Every structure is written in C-alpha cells, then in structure tokens.
C-alpha cells in the first residue's frame, strides 16, 4: 500500500467532547516539539514494544503484539498507527490494521487486509511515567479523527476486557457481544464504533 504522505502526520486543531482532557498546549520554542502526533514507522518498533510490554504484562501477563508483529504492522500499514511524542520521546501509541469481516477472529490478530473497511485497534498503551494524565483519552480521540478521515475506513473495532467497556463507550464504541478470541484464560468484549457516528459526535462537541 502506497502511503507517501502519512509518515509526518502533523497535529491539527481538534475539539474534544466534554469529560475528555484537553489537547496538549502550544509547542515551546526549542529543537524538538513539546508535543508531536505522527504515524509510526518500523524504526519506532522497539520503543513501541518496550511501552507495550510493560503496560500489558504487568496487568494481564500477555502482550497483544510481539516485536515482530509490531514491525510487521508498521511496515504494512503505518497510516493506521499513531504515536504521541513529548520532546522527541514516544510516550503513547496506538497500532491498528484493516480488517474485512463483520467480527474479529483469531486471524485478525496478525493480519492486515488492505481491502477492509474496519480499522482494528490492536493496542493502545501509555508509558508508565505518563499515565493518569488523560493521555490515552486524547490519543484515542485523535486516532479516531485520523482514521475517520481515510476514505476506506468506515468503522473502528477492538476487543477489551469488561472493565474497559465504559472507557471505550465514551468515544462512541458499542459492545457487539463476546469476542471469539480467547487468550489463555482471558475473555473479551468486542467493541464497534461507526466513524460516521463519531464525526457527528465531533460536530456536537463543537456546539
């Protein structure tokens, strides 16, 4: 897939709905921007995996993606990723791929289907030093804004543990029932978000 213009995604003004922390402040004047949002590249894979491993293994004992899978998705579909960098340091990320079926399956964990219309969010993680600051919320809102602007993408899908269902509902996701994917003893709820509905939510937040 040709992606000549997505590797340097620039921050854009974004109105957040009530209850979600505000977007980062203005960039300070020095060499590295105080806050930068951009699509990730394979060169970012090691930093991504370091954050992911600490965030997920400490909670569930499993990583959604191993290092090879991170590199795989950042090579095939970098436009479906988004990283938040503070003074050049990666502090939070989302990695996704396209999926072409109504529901997630075991295959969806490792595949990118270029003709799909669903952005499958594989992982969202925040560096431990930057948690409890609302960064996950800001990044997810920006990500949905970003992928929703891509003509091929009609919805976002993910799987999460039951405790996280209310968090994702704040962004327009709705439970689609138990996910067919099981990881060890862990079970998940599958969540769907129409990006057309998300655009309407953005418009309402501007009022």
Curated annotation (Swiss-Prot):
Result of altering residue 168 to F: Reduces catalytic activity 30-fold
Pathway: Aromatic compound metabolism; melatonin biosynthesis; melatonin from serotonin: step 1/2
Residue sites binding substrate per the record: 124, 159
Tissue-wise expression: Highest expression in the pineal gland, followed by retina. Expressed at much lower levels in brainstem and pituitary gland. AANAT activity also detected at low levels in the olfactory lobe.
Keyword DNA damage among UniProt keywords: no
Effect of residue 120 to A: Reduces catalytic activity 270-fold and decreases affinity for acetyl-coenzyme A
Modified residues (Phosphothreonine): 31
Stimuli inducing this protein: Exhibits night/day variations with a 7-fold increased activity at night. At the mRNA level, the nocturnal increase is lower than 2-fold.
Ranges of residues in domain N-acetyltransferase: 35-196
Catalytic activity: a 2-arylethylamine + acetyl-CoA = an N-acetyl-2-arylethylamine + CoA + H(+)
Gene Ontology molecular function, alphabetical: aralkylamine N-acetyltransferase activity
Outcome after substituting residue 57 to A: No effect on enzymatic activity
Region (YWHAZ-binding): 28-35
Its EC number(s): 2.3.1.87
Any Pfam family matching the protein: Acetyltransf_1
Keywords: Acyltransferase, Biological rhythms, Cytoplasm, Melatonin biosynthesis, Phosphoprotein, Transferase
Effect listed in the UniProt record for changing residue 122 to A: Reduces catalytic activity 270-fold and decreases affinity for acetyl-coenzyme A
Region (Disordered): 1-29
Site (Important for the catalytic mechanism): 120, 122
Subcellular localization: Cytoplasm
Cellular component GO terms, alphabetical: perinuclear region of cytoplasm
Family recorded in the similarity comment: Belongs to the acetyltransferase family. AANAT subfamily.
Subunit structure and binding partners: Monomer. Interacts with several 14-3-3 proteins, including YWHAB, YWHAE, YWHAG and YWHAZ, preferentially when phosphorylated at Thr-31. Phosphorylation on Ser-205 also allows binding to YWHAZ, but with a 10-fold lower affinity. The interaction with YWHAZ considerably increases affinity for arylalkylamines and acetyl-CoA and protects the enzyme from dephosphorylation and proteasomal degradation. It may also prevent thiol-dependent inactivation. The physiological stoichiometry of the interaction is not clear. In vitro studies show either 1:2 (i.e. 1 AANAT molecule per YWHAZ dimer) or 2:2.
Name of protein: Serotonin N-acetyltransferase
Organism: Ovis aries
Lineage of producing organism: Eukaryota, Metazoa, Chordata, Craniata, Vertebrata
